A protein has these predicted regions:
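Metal-dependent active-site segment of extracytoplasmic phospho-/sulfohydrolases and closely related
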Residues: 1-13, 85, 120, 140
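Glycine-centered secondary-structure boundary/capping sites
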Residues: 8, 18-20, 141, 145
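Short, surface-exposed, charged loop/turn segments at secondary-structure junctions
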Residues: 10-18, 99-105
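Acidic, His- and aromatic-enriched active-site or binding-groove loops in soluble protein domains
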Residues: 16-28
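Active-site neighborhoods of enzymes that stabilize oxyanions during catalysis
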Residues: 25-148
Length: 151
């Protein structure tokens, strides 16, 4: 659970590099195994990247505003990217900034994906039960703060 076997890979960096845009001037991208994050310096860059990656030959889609909200990243001020292109289950970005070669299995697909289920176990009663991935940071932070108070 949490890892899915890889069925294929796509070179998103090559696809975006062919759009006649200047990296650092028109856009910045970060290519991870299951997604690509984009920060745009102008609307034209956004339109070109979105048009290219919306082609069915790229097995994925851009995360919607509603999805960002449900994932707890809608008010991030662009920290996670202006756009996130998330690949479909079983596909990966290769090469990525994590690895030059494809992996046999990858984690980090959509939280709704059947293979991305998880469990939460604790040896003590938590201050609150995490509902999203972002909640785990808050839970760990509250635990550290409590430990520091006890010193």
């Amino acid at each position: 659970v949490g890892m899915l076997p890889c069925l294929g890979s796509v070179d998103l960096k090559k696809a975006v590099s062919g759009l006649n845009l200047k990296y650092g001037k028109d856009y910045v991208a970060f290519y991870e195994p299951t997604m690509a994050r984009f920060w745009y310096m102008n609307e034209s860059s956004r339109e070109k990247v979105r048009a290219e990656l919306s082609n069915p030959k790229y097995p994925g889609s851009f995360i919607s505003g509603a999805q960002k909200s449900s994932y707890g990243i809608s008010h991030d001020g662009g920290k996670f990217g202006d756009d996130i292109f998330l690949l479909n289950d079983g596909f990966q970005v290769s090469p990525s900034y994590i690895s030059r070669k494809p992996f046999k299995a990858v984690c980090g697909y959509s939280p709704e994906s059947e293979g991305m289920s998880a469990s939460f176990l604790s040896t003590c009663k938590p201050v609150f039960i995490p509902k999203t991935v972002a909640d785990f940071f808050k839970l760990m932070k509250s635990d550290v703060e409590e430990s520091v108070r006890d010193l």
